[in-house]
Amino acid sequence: QQDWLMRQIEAMIQAVLAVALGTSANEQTATQIEDSSYGKMLEKMIDDGDICAAEDLLFNDLDQSDLSWLQIALDFYSKLNNCSDDYLAMHDFSREEIDQGLRYICTLFGYDFLVSN
Protein backbone atom coordinates (compact mmCIF):
# COMPACT_ATOMS: atom_id res chain seq x y z
CA GLN A 1 0.00 0.00 0.00
CA GLN A 2 2.70 2.50 1.01
CA ASP A 3 4.91 1.61 -1.98
CA TRP A 4 1.95 2.24 -4.27
CA LEU A 5 1.31 5.61 -2.63
CA MET A 6 5.01 6.53 -2.89
CA ARG A 7 4.90 5.82 -6.63
CA GLN A 8 1.65 7.79 -7.01
CA ILE A 9 3.15 10.81 -5.23
CA GLU A 10 6.26 10.70 -7.40
CA ALA A 11 4.13 10.39 -10.56
CA MET A 12 2.06 13.43 -9.52
CA ILE A 13 5.21 15.46 -8.87
CA GLN A 14 6.66 14.51 -12.25
CA ALA A 15 3.40 15.35 -14.07
CA VAL A 16 3.19 18.80 -12.48
CA LEU A 17 6.88 19.44 -13.21
CA ALA A 18 6.40 18.51 -16.85
CA VAL A 19 3.26 20.58 -17.44
CA ALA A 20 3.74 23.56 -15.13
CA LEU A 21 7.47 24.05 -15.31
CA GLY A 22 8.43 22.35 -18.57
CA THR A 23 10.79 19.99 -16.77
CA SER A 24 11.16 16.52 -18.22
CA ALA A 25 10.24 13.62 -16.00
CA ASN A 26 13.85 12.45 -16.03
CA GLU A 27 15.33 15.68 -14.66
CA GLN A 28 16.02 15.84 -10.94
CA THR A 29 14.20 18.54 -9.00
CA ALA A 30 16.51 18.62 -6.00
CA THR A 31 18.66 21.45 -7.36
CA GLN A 32 16.03 24.15 -6.68
CA ILE A 33 15.54 23.23 -3.05
CA GLU A 34 19.25 22.72 -2.48
CA ASP A 35 20.25 25.98 -4.18
CA SER A 36 17.86 28.28 -2.33
CA SER A 37 18.35 29.34 1.26
CA TYR A 38 14.63 28.80 1.85
CA GLY A 39 14.89 25.30 0.43
CA LYS A 40 17.92 24.56 2.59
CA MET A 41 15.98 25.72 5.64
CA LEU A 42 13.05 23.41 4.77
CA GLU A 43 15.42 20.54 4.13
CA LYS A 44 17.14 21.09 7.50
CA MET A 45 13.75 21.15 9.22
CA ILE A 46 12.89 17.82 7.58
CA ASP A 47 16.25 16.37 8.63
CA ASP A 48 15.70 17.66 12.18
CA GLY A 49 12.25 16.05 12.29
CA ASP A 50 10.34 19.35 12.24
CA ILE A 51 8.21 18.18 9.32
CA CYS A 52 4.87 19.65 10.44
CA ALA A 53 6.48 23.01 11.21
CA ALA A 54 8.24 22.98 7.83
CA GLU A 55 4.98 22.33 6.00
CA ASP A 56 3.22 25.06 8.00
CA LEU A 57 6.03 27.50 7.16
CA LEU A 58 5.80 26.62 3.47
CA PHE A 59 2.03 27.15 3.44
CA ASN A 60 2.37 30.49 5.23
CA ASP A 61 5.12 31.86 2.98
CA LEU A 62 3.89 30.49 -0.34
CA ASP A 63 3.32 33.03 -3.13
CA GLN A 64 0.83 31.63 -5.64
CA SER A 65 1.82 34.24 -8.22
CA ASP A 66 5.41 32.94 -8.39
CA LEU A 67 6.00 29.52 -9.97
CA SER A 68 9.34 29.19 -8.20
CA TRP A 69 7.28 28.54 -5.06
CA LEU A 70 5.58 25.65 -6.84
CA GLN A 71 9.03 24.23 -7.58
CA ILE A 72 10.07 24.63 -3.93
CA ALA A 73 6.85 22.94 -2.76
CA LEU A 74 7.29 20.06 -5.22
CA ASP A 75 10.88 19.61 -4.07
CA PHE A 76 9.73 19.67 -0.45
CA TYR A 77 7.17 16.91 -1.03
CA SER A 78 9.62 14.92 -3.12
CA LYS A 79 12.13 15.06 -0.26
CA LEU A 80 9.42 13.97 2.20
CA ASN A 81 8.35 11.17 -0.12
CA ASN A 82 11.91 9.82 -0.02
CA CYS A 83 11.78 9.55 3.79
CA SER A 84 11.01 6.14 5.25
CA ASP A 85 7.58 5.43 6.68
CA ASP A 86 9.25 4.91 10.07
CA TYR A 87 10.93 8.33 9.93
CA LEU A 88 7.68 10.01 8.95
CA ALA A 89 5.76 8.23 11.73
CA MET A 90 8.46 9.07 14.28
CA HIS A 91 7.84 12.74 13.49
CA ASP A 92 4.03 12.57 13.42
CA PHE A 93 3.70 12.68 9.64
CA SER A 94 2.40 10.17 7.11
CA ARG A 95 2.60 9.40 3.44
CA GLU A 96 -1.11 10.26 3.22
CA GLU A 97 -0.30 13.76 4.51
CA ILE A 98 2.33 14.10 1.77
CA ASP A 99 -0.35 13.17 -0.76
CA GLN A 100 -2.85 15.64 0.73
CA GLY A 101 -0.32 18.47 0.92
CA LEU A 102 0.81 17.92 -2.65
CA ARG A 103 -2.78 17.95 -3.90
CA TYR A 104 -3.45 21.15 -1.93
CA ILE A 105 -0.41 22.89 -3.44
CA CYS A 106 -1.40 21.83 -6.94
CA THR A 107 -4.91 23.17 -6.37
CA LEU A 108 -3.53 26.52 -5.16
CA PHE A 109 -1.49 26.86 -8.34
CA GLY A 110 -4.32 25.70 -10.62
CA TYR A 111 -2.90 22.28 -11.49
CA ASP A 112 -5.44 20.20 -9.60
CA PHE A 113 -6.51 18.58 -12.88
CA LEU A 114 -3.13 16.81 -12.91
CA VAL A 115 -3.57 15.24 -9.49
CA SER A 116 -7.29 14.45 -9.32
CA ASN A 117 -8.29 10.89 -8.49
Where are these regions (language model features)?
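Conserved small-residue packing positions in alpha-helical repeats and bundles
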Residues: 12, 41-45, 77-78
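Short, charge-rich amphipathic alpha-helical segments embedded
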Residues: 17-38, 56-88
